[in-house]
């Protein structure tokens, strides 16, 4: 069944998907609309760090927006990101809106510091959301045991909680 990208849950995110909002830097990062432009990556894990590092090949600057005050990524990945001259971490911050739906393209993000409440706008041409995945297991709820995140619980030999279902 696979998994789907976790979304920010913003109306502007949905409206601007494929118009500057994307979930895959390696798929879309080299597109002309992103070249030599400021870009935003949302997230703080290994995937977000990989996306940010990849995008430094194309973007003028990459803002790494993370809701915490340090990365959750592995130490080696975090060190690479924090040393890179084209990556600017934006700590303790969440995206509250992606701009600009009226122009039908991404022109920036409105962000809010979760500690101070201060808001500001970061100008950018693209938003790369890298905040994890959600398993596509909705159809199995109530039929097969799922963990707290919605993943199928496996027993020995890849068996599930239902005999004969692997």
Task: Go through each PLM region and give its residues.
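Glycine-rich Rossmann-fold phosphate-binding loop(s) that bind the pyrophosphate
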Residues: 43-45
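N-terminal Rossmann-fold NAD(P) dinucleotide-binding loop
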Residues: 48-49
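A Rossmann-like FAD-binding core segment of flavoenzymes
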Residues: 56-156
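FAD-site-proximal beta/loop scaffold in flavoenzymes
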Residues: 4, 9, 14-33, 131-166
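Short coil/turn connectors at secondary-structure junctions
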Residues: 18, 35-38, 58-60, 85, ...
